[in-house]
């Protein structure tokens, strides 16, 4: 019988204890690994929207209101940027409806741009990314070189156009969501900006359907008419310039989410953009009647061109359109109604407005998502100048007389004046939510803006801008 020495038995006891400790440690690590891989959310639909607590744009150093929706009740939400938690003290917790509200302060040194904010959730786990845009601050300048005259009109101003023949201005307005019951087409005297005539559109078909609210506007001096888009009814209407009498109300559904309407008087054709689709609908402006549908094919694989803003240059009979979703521009021959080219817009995120300079064949494209104006060679598609104009660069008008582009920056509340080489000549304060601008062919600019609320003294105005 062999008996192990005492030292050997002691060694076995040490080995057993060590083995047990190792197994316990491994078990703990395994448990920890399992806990970090908790059951994922099989039906994750959480989304977060950010808006400024004060002002009209998110800026460096400003406070942001977060509105979270679609989360699982009780779900814990942590936000981070570059691996740094933005709510390190405590996770946000979704309420019984799966929502949460919170505020967050943007660092003073935050760079302008769209920042990828990572959403990490627990109980159950999930992850997503949402873009948080921090807009640049472009200082006001050049006010001493311009004379601005502003007049308050009616609630909900959208677009403005002018008659080269009479000088009269035509302005559209609409208030609220469907069914829209407050909407007007205005005719203004350009001398004092007083309302000469105003019309509430006819009732739209259907029970409690509101009116044929007017949004986009385009003047046709050859036929003495003014075209409007009825966005909520997906169609267009034509009125007389003289007394705003209705010439024709086209049937609902003809132009899905009709946004912009422009007229080539020499060709006697009108064109309306079907927003967020690849389609533009052309009309015989004299009859008036539908001509055809023009479809723009995107160059981005698997994506669809989503036209919103559109411009017609009658000197070259070309249509220019931009795609909100694919960041592309299209050139269309208004005579043949054929798409000539489609190209990517370098430096643009969610482009909205477009204008053209026939002398240089340059496009001026505003991009709301990147807060800039892109000056693009229409022949090559190359971006020649990338100009930061301010929060929410929305629309642009080019004046061939003064050879300047005028950009309405919705979030910044400004009108930026830029030359064809990308130099900012002025940045003028324009009031709340500048929406649209037009040039009259004589070097005068008219811009309209919307109000932030009923008591906003700087909203719902038309402003005449003239160089001194």
Language-model features and meaning:
Residues 1-32:
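Gram-negative bacterial Sec-dependent N-terminal signal peptides
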Residues 34-468:
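Predominantly soluble domains enriched in secretory-pathway, periplasmic, or organellar proteins
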């Amino acid at each position: 019988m062999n008996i192990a020495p005492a030292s050997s038995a002691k060694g076995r006891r040490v080995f057993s204890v060590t083995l047990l400790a190792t197994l316990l440690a491994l078990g703990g690590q395994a448990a920890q690994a399992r806990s970090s891989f908790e059951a994922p959310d099989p039906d994750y639909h959480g989304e977060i929207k950010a808006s400024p607590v004060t002002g009209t744009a998110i800026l460096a150093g400003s406070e942001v209101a977060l509105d979270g929706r679609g989360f699982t009740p009780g779900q814990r939400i942590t936000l981070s940027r570059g691996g740094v938690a933005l709510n390190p003290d405590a996770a946000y917790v979704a309420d019984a409806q799966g929502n949460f509200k919170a505020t967050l302060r943007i660092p003073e040194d935050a760079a302008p741009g769209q920042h990828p904010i990572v959403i990490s959730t627990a109980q159950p786990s999930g992850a997503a990314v949402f873009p948080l845009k921090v807009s640049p601050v472009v200082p006001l300048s050049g006010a001493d070189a311009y004379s601005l005259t502003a007049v308050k009109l009616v609630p909900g101003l959208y677009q403005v156009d002018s008659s080269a023949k009479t000088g009269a201005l035509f302005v559209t307005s609409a208030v609220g969501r469907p069914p829209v019951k407050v909407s007007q087409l205005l005719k203004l005297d350009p001398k004092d900006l007083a309302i000469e005539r105003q019309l509430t559109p006819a009732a739209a078909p259907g029970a409690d359907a509101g009116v044929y609210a007017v949004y986009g506007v385009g003047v046709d001096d050859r036929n003495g008419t003014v075209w409007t888009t009825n966005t909520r009814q997906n169609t267009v209407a034509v009125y007389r310039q003289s007394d705003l009498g209705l010439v024709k109300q086209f049937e609902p559904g003809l132009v899905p989410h009709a946004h912009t309407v422009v007229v080539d008087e020499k060709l006697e054709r009108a064109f309306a953009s079907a927003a967020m689709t690849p389609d533009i609908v052309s009309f015989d402006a004299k009859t008036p009647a539908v001509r055809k549908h023009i479809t723009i094919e995107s160059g981005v694989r698997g994506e669809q061109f989503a036209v919103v803003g559109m411009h017609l240059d009658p000197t070259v009979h070309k249509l220019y359109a931009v795609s909100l979703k694919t960041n592309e521009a299209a050139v269309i021959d208004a005579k043949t109604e054929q798409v000539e080219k489609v190209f990517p817009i370098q430096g643009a995120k969610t482009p909205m407005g477009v204008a053209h300079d026939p002398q240089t064949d340059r496009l001026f494209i505003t991009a709301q998502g990147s807060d800039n104006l892109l000056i693009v060679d229409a022949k090559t598609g190359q971006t020649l100048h990338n100009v930061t104009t301010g929060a929410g660069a929305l629309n642009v008008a080019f004046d061939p007389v003064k050879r300047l582009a005028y950009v309405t920056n919705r979030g910044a509340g400004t009108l930026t004046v830029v030359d064809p080489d990308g130099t900012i000549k002025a940045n003028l304060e324009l009031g709340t939510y500048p929406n649209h601008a037009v040039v009259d062919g004589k070097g005068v600019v008219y811009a309209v803006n919307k109000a932030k609320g009923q008591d906003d003294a700087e909203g719902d105005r038309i402003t005449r801008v003239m160089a001194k």
